Amino acid sequence: MMLNMLAKGQSAVITAINASKELKSRFNSFGIVKGAIVNVEQYSLAKQTMEIKINKTRMALRFSEAEQVEISE
């Protein structure tokens, strides 16, 4: 299952990141790494971005980026 499929308020564990080296590096700097617990806080009106929370850090991801993050509930 991919991160962009989670509903608002749901949590899951990141199991893999299928992204370019540059995007993986960016994700790593935000704490988006294998084993991290991610919570979906909200979606934008057009559902082009989503706000997620990992630990105490909130961030916005494009749907295209969230499609590259595999999760397990």
What residues fall within each predicted segment?
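Absolute protein N-terminus
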Residues: 1-2, 73
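Short alpha-helix capping/helix-loop boundary micro-motifs
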Residues: 23-26
